[in-house]
A protein has these predicted regions:
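Short, contiguous alpha-helical
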Residues: 2-123, 161-199
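Acidic/histidine-rich alpha-helical segments that form the ligand environment
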Residues: 124-156, 173-183
Length: 199
């Protein structure tokens, strides 16, 4: 029977020359970093479509049963609206979805900054094409500033929107909700843009 070589590595112990894959992986990210990364990813997907939108895309109606925006007597745009969601739900145009983004995001920012939240009727859609794209990009810049100022401790505070003062929901939930709502609306706009381009 052969005698084991004392200089040979013990097969029952980890090889000291092999890196520990877990220990040598990426450094852990904080909750604020992860939420910011998710927001930036969502925005990059949205930007793909914003860069390709034509002014005529905004009011295009893919089906007769649509929600869109209409010129009022004073020249501003007014969205279709119902206090109780209709059954069946109308298909929104790109104009309506972009106004909707501006509405919920502006109100979210009002709450974040401690301002008096604007009413739905206070949110004025700038019009199709570049004005609305600039508006949405401006909201993104303002939201980035909010995210940059948040700490993980801030995320644990009770949310004031969209769940008014419910201790079950925190600022972290609000930030995650913005990411999700923006992704949903960006997907809707992207799908409408591609349908019109293909029609």
């Amino acid at each position: 029977m052969s005698t084991p070589d004392p200089s040979a590595p013990d097969p029952t112990t980890p090889n000291p020359g092999t890196p520990d894959l877990i220990a040598s992986g990426p450094s852990p990210v904080s909750r604020t970093q992860l939420l910011r990364w998710q927001f930036d990813l969502t925005w990059s997907l949205f930007e793909y479509h914003l860069e390709r939108l034509e002014p005529s895309d905004f009011l295009w109606e893919p089906v007769p049963h649509c929600w869109t925006l209409h010129r009022s007597a004073d020249g501003t745009w007014e969205p279709d609206w119902a206090e109780t969601e209709p059954d069946s739900v109308p298909v929104p145009t790109i104009a309506w979805i972009s106004w909707h983004i501006g509405w919920w995001w502006s109100v979210t920012l009002d709450h974040t900054h401690g301002r008096q939240p604007r009413k739905r009727t206070d949110i004025i859609w700038p019009g199709g094409g570049a004005p609305t794209v600039r508006w949405l990009r401006g909201l993104r810049t303002e939201w980035q500033t909010v995210l940059d100022g948040l700490t993980d401790t801030d995320l644990d505070a009770t949310a004031s929107f969209p769940w008014p003062d419910d201790p079950a929901y925190t600022v972290a939930h609000t930030v995650a909700w913005v990411n999700t709502e923006l992704l949903k609306n960006a997907t809707e706009i992207g799908q409408l843009r591609m349908l019109r381009a293909a029609s």
